[in-house]
């Protein structure tokens, strides 16, 4: 299993709970290739980091029936229930 560091220097590994960092996502290539208004659940989390490949991670969302999605690992941050 691969382990990557995000821009916030938080090490993420498979099966960690994650959410998308809004500042890193908005205006990114992934955001431009998606819906103009991103769904709130990606910023609220939690999602499970399933696997990584290169600079991307596959995330599975928990709260709604949504397809798994590949996102840049640098756009992810650890989920906390704060």
UniProtKB/Swiss-Prot annotation:
Keywords: Membrane, NAD, NADP, Organellar chromatophore, Plastid, Plastoquinone, Quinone, Thylakoid, Translocase. It is an enzyme of class 7 (translocase). InterPro entries: NdhO. It is a peripheral membrane protein. It is found in: Plastid, Organellar chromatophore thylakoid membrane. Its EC number is 7.1.1.-. GO terms for cellular component: organellar chromatophore thylakoid membrane; plasma membrane; plastid. Its main location: plastid. It comes from the Eukaryota. It catalyses: a plastoquinone + NADH + (n+1) H(+)(in) = a plastoquinol + NAD(+) + n H(+)(out); a plastoquinone + NADPH + (n+1) H(+)(in) = a plastoquinol + NADP(+) + n H(+)(out). GO terms for molecular function: oxidoreductase activity, acting on NAD(P)H, quinone or similar compound as acceptor; quinone binding. NDH-1 can be composed of about 15 different subunits; different subcomplexes with different compositions have been identified which probably have different functions. NDH-1 shuttles electrons from an unknown electron donor, via FMN and iron-sulfur (Fe-S) centers, to quinones in the respiratory and/or the photosynthetic chain. The immediate electron acceptor for the enzyme in this species is believed to be plastoquinone. Couples the redox reaction to proton translocation, and thus conserves the redox energy in a proton gradient. Cyanobacterial NDH-1 also plays a role in inorganic carbon-concentration. Belongs to the complex I NdhO subunit family. This is NAD(P)H-quinone oxidoreductase subunit O, organellar chromatophore. It comes from Paulinella chromatophora.
């Amino acid at each position: 299993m691969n382990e990557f560091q995000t821009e916030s220097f938080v090490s993420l590994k498979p099966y960690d709970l994650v959410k998308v960092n809004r500042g890193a996502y908005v205006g990114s290539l992934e955001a431009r290739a998606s819906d103009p208004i991103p769904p709130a659940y990606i910023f609220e989390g939690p999602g499970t980091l399933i696997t990584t490949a290169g600079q991307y991670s596959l995330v599975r969302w928990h709260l709604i029936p949504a397809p798994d999605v590949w996102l840049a690992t640098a756009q992810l941050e650890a989920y906390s229930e704060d």
